[in-house]
Regions:
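An aromatic- and glycine-enriched ligand-binding surface/loop that stacks and positions planar moieties
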Residues: 22-99, 172, 202, 207, ...
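Conserved, well-structured interaction surfaces
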Residues: 43-51, 55-61, 65-66, 88-169, ...
C-alpha cells in the first residue's frame, strides 16, 4: 500500500507543474494554460489529463479545495447557516467583519472569498476542458482501450465542479473550451446548467469503474461510478431549486412534475432520487456499524464513505484546517498540536441535538467537544491562569468580546478522530476528508419518499438505529433535523435549509435582512470584479 501511495504522490506532485492557474473571465490572465503537447503516450494522458485534476479537489490555501481549507466552498456552505458560527473573540476572528458577514448573510458583491471561490471552481472547469482537448487530440491517432474511461472521468470532474457553481451561484456561464473568446462567453439560466450537468453525469456513468474510490488502490480518491451516482441523486433531490430560474418569486416547480429519463423509464424527481440511492446499495455501500469509523485516523476501509479527499501527511499537501481552527489553543497544545479557538456550534444546533437533556442525541459527543476537556491520557486541560478548560456551549453568540466567556464559549468541532501524529499544526493528518457517504443517501431516499407521498420511516430509522437513537416518524421536519444530527460539520446545511425553505429565516444572533424573504441570498452574487471584466454577466437578483 505504501509503495502505491508513493507512486500516486509522485504523479500528483508532477502534475502541479503541468497546469497553471487560469482565472476564468480575466481579461489578461497572469498564467496561460500550456499549449505544448504533453500527451504522447497513454500513460502521459492519464498523468497530464486525468490525474493532474485531482490536485485541486483538496487544498492547502484559502478558497482552494472542496473541503479542508478556509474561505471557500465549505465555509460558504457552513458558516452561513444555523449549524455553525465563528464568534468574534476580542481581537480574534473579526477579520474585517468577514465571519460576521457570512453568518448575517451580509456578504456584498465585492467579497474576496466569494470571488476566490468562483475562480477556484472555474479554474478546475477550464483545466478539465483542456484535458478533454488533449485526450481528443491523442485519440486522433491512437485507439487505446483506456481512452473512453479517461474522457468520461474528466467529464465527470467538470460536471461535479459545475454542480458546485450551480449550487452557489445559480446562473453561470457554461464553457466547454479551454480558451473561450471573451465575447463568446454568455450566462446560462440555472435550469440549463442543471440539465447540462445531469445529462453529462448520466452519459459518463456507464463508462466508469464501480470501484469504491475511498479505498486505497488504483482508483483511490478518483471519481468512479458510485460518486457520479451519488451526485445524480443529489441533483434530483434539489431539482425543484436548481430548475427554478427565478428563485426570488417564492414559487418553485413541483418535483412530481420534473421528469427524467432513467434507464429507459420516465421518473419524477423523487423517484429519480430513490432510484440512484438504491443503485448505491446495489454497489455494496452500507452503514458502518460504528459511526466513528468513517472519520477515524485510517478510514480508508469504510464501506460507507463514497468520495473522500485522500490525506497523508508525508505524501500529500491536502490540509484539514477545521479541527485546528475550532479548538482552544491549550486544548490543541495538549494533543501536541495547535489551535485557533474559533468555530462553534450554534444555539440552534444545540437545541436540535438536545444538548444537556435526557434526550440528547448520541452523536453530540462524537461531533462536539463540550464541558471539561482532557488530553489523550485522560488528564485535565487547564487555561493559562490555571483554571480548568471548560467549553460552555450555551454562551455562544456572534460577538462575545469582553464577556467572561470570550475564550471558552461554544461547543467545538470534534467528529474526526484526533491524530496526535499530525503535522503542520495538526492540519496534515491521516484521516481522509469525507465528502459523500451512504448515510446521506439513505436520508435522501427517506426525504424523496415522503415528498412523493410515501413512507420514509425505514431509511430514517436505519440511520438513527446505528447510533441507538430512538425511532422517529419520517416527517419532513424530522428529516431536516436528522440531516443536521447525522451530517454535522460535513458541509450540507446551507443546501438543506434552502431546499426546505428555511435558509433566510431569522435565528439567534441573525436577524433577517431587508427583502431577504424573497430568497435572494439563497445564491451568492456574481463577483463584481468578474462582471467588470465581462459586462455580459448579469448580477443575481437582489444584489
Amino acid at each position: 500500500m505504501k509503495e502505491y501511495l508513493k507512486k500516486i504522490s509522485l504523479v500528483l506532485a508532477t502534475c502541479t507543474f503541468l497546469f497553471s492557474c487560469d482565472k476564468f473571465l480575466e481579461e489578461n490572465p497572469k498564467d496561460k494554460l500550456p499549449e505544448d503537447d504533453v500527451c504522447n503516450s497513454i500513460s502521459e494522458v492519464y498523468l497530464n489529463a486525468v490525474a493532474s485534476l485531482y490536485t485541486y479537489v483538496g487544498g492547502y490555501s484559502d478558497s482552494q479545495g472542496l473541503q479542508g481549507t478556509g474561505r471557500g466552498v465549505y465555509d460558504l456552505n457552513t458558516f452561513t447557516t444555523d449549524e455553525a458560527i465563528i464568534p468574534t473573540r476580542g481581537g480574534d476572528w473579526y477579520d474585517g467583519g468577514f465571519w460576521q458577514g457570512l453568518f448575517l448573510h451580509d456578504w456584498g458583491i465585492e467579497n474576496d472569498a466569494i470571488q476566490a471561490t468562483w475562480e477556484y471552481l472555474y479554474k478546475v472547469v477550464m483545466l478539465s476542458n483542456k484535458s478533454l482537448e488533449r485526450i481528443d487530440k491523442f485519440a486522433e491517432n491512437h485507439s487505446d482501450a483506456e481512452l473512453p474511461a479517461y474522457r468520461a472521468e474528466v467529464r465527470a470532474m467538470r460536471a461535479m465542479y459545475y454542480y458546485y457553481l450551480l449550487d452557489l451561484f445559480g446562473r453561470v456561464p457554461l464553457v466547454q473550451s479551454s480558451s473561450p473568446a471573451m465575447k463568446d462567453v454568455v450566462q446560462s439560466e440555472r435550469k440549463t446548467v442543471f440539465e447540462f450537468i445531469f445529462k453529462e453525469l448520466q452519459e459518463v456513468a456507464p463508462l466508469l469503474s464501480e470501484v469504491h474510490s475511498n479505498q486505497t488502490g488504483p482508483y483511490y480518491g478518483r471519481i468512479t461510478r458510485p460518486v457520479v451516482t451519488f451526485l445524480l441523486a443529489k441533483l434530483a433531490l434539489n431539482a425543484e431549486v436548481y430548475t427554478d430560474n427565478d428563485w426570488t418569486d417564492n414559487e418553485r416547480p413541483d418535483g412530481k412534475n420534473i421528469k427524467f429519463m432513467v434507464d429507459g423509464n420516465e421518473l419524477n424527481a423523487w423517484e429519480t432520487v430513490i432510484y440512484y440511492c438504491d443503485q448505491l446499495k446495489v454497489m455494496n455501500y452500507k452503514l458502518e456499524p460504528e459511526y466513528e469509523t468513517n472519520f477515524s485516523i485510517f478510514n480508508e476501509p469504510s464501506v460507507e464513505n463514497i468520495f473522500t479527499i485522500p490525506m497523508n501527511k508525508t505524501l500529500y499537501t491536502n490540509q484539514m484546517q477545521y479541527l485546528f481552527r475550532s479548538r482552544h489553543y491549550n486544548h490543541a497544545k495538549a494533543y501536541g498540536l495547535s489551535g485557533e479557538n474559533g468555530p462553534s456550534a450554534t444555539i440552534e444546533a444545540l437545541e436540535t441535538f438536545g444538548y444537556g437533556t435526557a434526550a440528547q442525541d448520541p452523536r453530540f459527543d462524537i461531533c462536539y467537544f463540550a464541558g471539561e476537556m482532557y488530553d489523550l491520557k485522560g488528564d485535565i486541560i487547564k487555561l493559562d491562569d490555571g483554571t480548568v478548560l471548560v467549553y460552555l456551549p450555551w454562551e455562544v453568540a456572534l460577538d462575545i468580546t469582553d464577556t467572561p466567556y470570550e475564550q471558552t464559549a461554544g461547543a467545538r468541532m470534534k467528529k474526526y478522530e484526533v491524530d496526535p501524529t499530525a503535522t503542520k499544526d495538526g492540519k496534515l493528518m491521516e484521516n481522509d476528508i469525507v465528502l459523500f457517504r451512504y448515510a446521506d443517501a439513505l436520508l435522501m431516499k427517506s426525504e424523496a419518499k415522503v415528498r412523493n407521498g410515501a413512507n420514509g420511516d425505514v431509511e430514517l430509522n436505519q440511520v438513527r438505529s446505528r447510533v441507538k437513537a430512538a425511532r422517529r416518524p419520517a416527517t419532513l421536519e424530522n428529516i431536516l433535523s436528522e440531516r443536521q444530527l447525522e451530517l454535522a460539520w460535513e458541509g450540507w446545511r446551507r443546501q438543506d435549509l434552502i431546499r426546505f425553505g428555511m435558509f433566510t429565516r431569522a435565528y439567534n444572533s441573525r436577524p433577517q435582512l431587508p427583502n431577504e424573504e424573497t430568497g435572494y441570498t439563497t445564491v451568492f452574487p456574481i463577483p463584481e470584479k468578474i462582471r467588470v471584466m465581462n459586462t455580459k454577466l448579469v448580477q443575481n437578483p437582489g444584489y
